[in-house]
Amino acid sequence: MLKILQKIMAVGTVTEAWDAGPTPERFRGRVEPAGGSCASCGACLAACPVGAIEKDGDSITVNQRACIFCGRCVERCERGLLTQTGDYKLAELGGQLLGEAVRAGITRTLGRSLHVRHLDVGSCNACDFELNQLLGPVYDLQQYGVDFVASPRHADLLMVTGVVTRNLTQALLMTYEATPAPRLVMAVGACAAAGRTFGAKNYAVRGGADALVPVDIYVPGCPPRPQALLYGILLALGRIEKA
């Protein structure tokens, strides 16, 4: 115990603001068009394993919810019309949070104290590992008045990870119904946000979380960084503005 106290005193405070830590150089974030004339070769569409790229004439759009940031499209584009950035602030609001009046009411009710119930409905655990980091001393989720709870009956926010499998469909529906209103649902990662990771049609999966329950916050990524998760939570609570 004495050695632990000595180490704590020597290291000092390690907790940082949600956006204070720099992203590593090798981090892969948002993929976006870089501009220029598309040759319509279709190489990027063929390279994308989740069908996140859509082409309309000469314009290319990337479905950020479905994108797993593998970078294959960037590598295959001979004209360099796609670029991969280090941007992780991809969270977007949906559902009831799109209405200003409803969002204001939810912010007043949950803005300073939010209890989260995590539900894995079929993930590879990568998103779950990132969630665990929120409870460590660096990101310290509790400094924002947010904490995880063991029961959906005590929760305000249902945080869903993984593509919804058929075997866990009932678990998702029952957990959602057990969460008291007003309640929010956050889809964490590309699997929960879009449900395309294992194909749009698959005998074992239902799709994304919004195929079964209304989703209010989407946090894309494969997996999303802890900062991306914090950005999504704080954005939903009205504590920060959309980047």
Regions found by a protein language model. Name each.
Residues L131, Y139, G145-A228:
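Cofactor-cradling patches in redox/metallo enzymes
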Residues I8, G36, Q64-R65, G80, ...:
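Fold-independent oxyanion-binding glycine-rich loops
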Residues M1-P49:
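Ferredoxin-type iron-sulfur electron-transfer modules and their immediate structural context
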Residues A194, I233, A243:
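Long C-terminal interaction/binding lobes of large macromolecular proteins
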Residues L2, A10, V14, V74-D156, ...:
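Flanking helices and flexible, charged tails adjoining ferredoxin-like Fe-S electron-transfer domains
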Residues L229-A236:
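Short amphipathic C-terminal alpha-helix that caps PH/PH-like domains
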